[in-house]
A protein has these predicted regions:
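Metalloprotease/metallohydrolase-associated module, dominated by Zn2+-dependent proteases
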Residues: 1-11, 15-17, 26-38, 42-44, ...
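Short pre-active-site segment immediately N-terminal to the catalytic Zn-binding motif
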Residues: 35-40, 47-71
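Short, solvent-exposed loop/turn segments at secondary-structure junctions
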Residues: 54-55, 75, 128
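Alpha-helix capping and helix-coil boundary motifs
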Residues: 62, 84-85, 104-108
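Solvent-exposed, acidic/flexible segments
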Residues: 63-71, 80, 114-118
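Catalytic Zn2+-binding segment of zinc metalloproteases
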Residues: 74-93
Length: 156
């Protein structure tokens, strides 16, 4: 958690700006809105997320339970709680390397999405958000007219 806090503070001071900070399920979500890209990195209870749009100030809860990126990053928080300090070496560092070397597979996902630790985060998120918020990972992608499901973009 200390490393996640430090990374979030460093990111806000010297990297991309953090436009809002929200809390859900014991995790801190530091969001950079209108960033031009959608990506996230989670260390401990700190989920640092870049999004291409904005979140209405009073609607973070609804936004988070409808945006699979937020749910996926929360899955990493759950995984980190289970793995403790080993998370940094078994998930964190390998994930940074995988993301850097990722390439597209088909129309929906980069190769990074298929890494075991990414899929484990998706499974943990699917279980948590299904149990606590009624989210169905196999329903159509939220806020979209697409037939694709969350699982199509965030494989289990």
């Amino acid at each position: 958690t200390g490393l996640g806090y430090d990374y979030t503070q460093f990111r806000n001071a010297f990297g991309s700006s953090i436009d809002r900070v929200d809390y859900l399920g014991g995790a801190t979500f530091a969001t950079n809105e209108n960033s031009g890209k959608r990506q996230g990195i989670t260390l401990g209870n700190y989920c640092n997320i870049d999004i291409t749009d904005t979140i209405n100030s009073s609607e973070f809860y609804n936004y988070a339970i409808q945006d699979p990126l937020y749910m996926h990053e929360y899955g990493h928080t759950i995984d980190g709680r289970k793995r403790g300090f080993a998370y940094l070496f078994t998930v964190g560092i390998p994930s940074v390397i995988s993301a850097k070397n990722s390439h597209n597979i088909g129309r929906l996902r980069p190769s990074h999405s298929y890494e075991p630790y990414k899929r484990r985060a998706n499974r943990l998120a699917a279980k948590y958000f299904s149990k606590n918020y009624g989210v169905n990972w196999f329903s159509p992608y939220p806020n979209s007219n697409s037939p694709w499901t969350i699982a199509d973009y965030y494989p289990l």
